[in-house]
């Protein structure tokens, strides 16, 4: 039978931690140092064993003979219980308590313990599948089976209008009628017919009128024609100061020019051009101011056509008729 010992009797050999004095007795100083060094060795040993726990599980067959009994280590390295562990007097704690303390300090709170390294992949796969299921559940939307679209939200097609008329006639027992709305009479305004814009290829440089379009009213080339169809498409090009200042070689040698009015050179002399212009101006002035005599009065349609033709009084009439300006 052990004698009744006070619960704090084993603290007599160790200085009190709450004492005001910082000096320690010289008798027990060596014992405290040895005790602290042994505790450090135990902590280092358990930290190493915990870090190498996975490798020890893989090589369990080779490490069975090298395992050390926990009670033997406790009996050798801990002759006295530590003063900061809450325990009963003259009682020793197993090394499992140290192991739990070290694991709780070193391991994060959110991680799960993995005893078998090969089971880690299975745990990860199960976690991934559970997360996917959660996401699918969050994305799923419950559809109300009793939901029906309102009749007025349907598109206005012939079938839907017939359905609406049938539904309303069945519900009210009366034929479907639209609500009467007050409308104000608008005075009819006269609008000019909209002219569709003709497709015009603006890349072409149209500086001349199309003969077939101006005479016949149509052109077989359409908007691909290189000539202007109307004055709105006609473009004026800038003429240089040397335009038609030199005589045309074809005109002087042959008496005509195949280019006609497109030729950039002068057809005939300056005097010929002046006479031709004066003749046209004099004819237009005479016809506008002086009336025709009774002897030359038009008796028939043929006479009217003959009088309407211009007369050239110049000697080289054929040459002037070939001139096109």
Swiss-Prot record:
Gene3D superfamilies: Zinc finger, CCCH-type
Zinc finger (C3H1-type): 204-232, 242-270
Keywords: Metal-binding, Repeat, RNA-binding, Zinc, Zinc-finger
Residue ranges of the region described as Disordered: 284-306
UniProt induction comment: By transcription factors AFT1 and AFT2 in response to iron deficiency.
GO BP annotation list: intracellular iron ion homeostasis; nuclear-transcribed mRNA catabolic process
GO cellular component: nucleus
InterPro entries documented for this protein: ZFP36-like, Znf_CCCH, Znf_CCCH_sf
Gene Ontology terms, MF aspect: mRNA binding; zinc ion binding
UniProt biased composition (Polar residues): 292-306
Source superkingdom: Eukaryota
Keyword Zinc-finger assigned: yes
SUPFAM superfamilies per the UniProt record, alphabetical: CCCH zinc finger (SSF90229)
SMART domains: ZnF_C3H1
Keyword Metal-binding: yes
Known function: Binds to specific AU-rich elements (ARE) in the 3'-untranslated region of target mRNAs and promotes their degradation. In response to iron deficiency, promotes the decay of many mRNAs encoding proteins involved in iron-dependent pathways. Negatively regulates primarily iron-dependent mitochondrial processes including respiration and amino acid biosynthesis.
Protein name: mRNA decay factor CTH1
Gene name of the record: CTH1
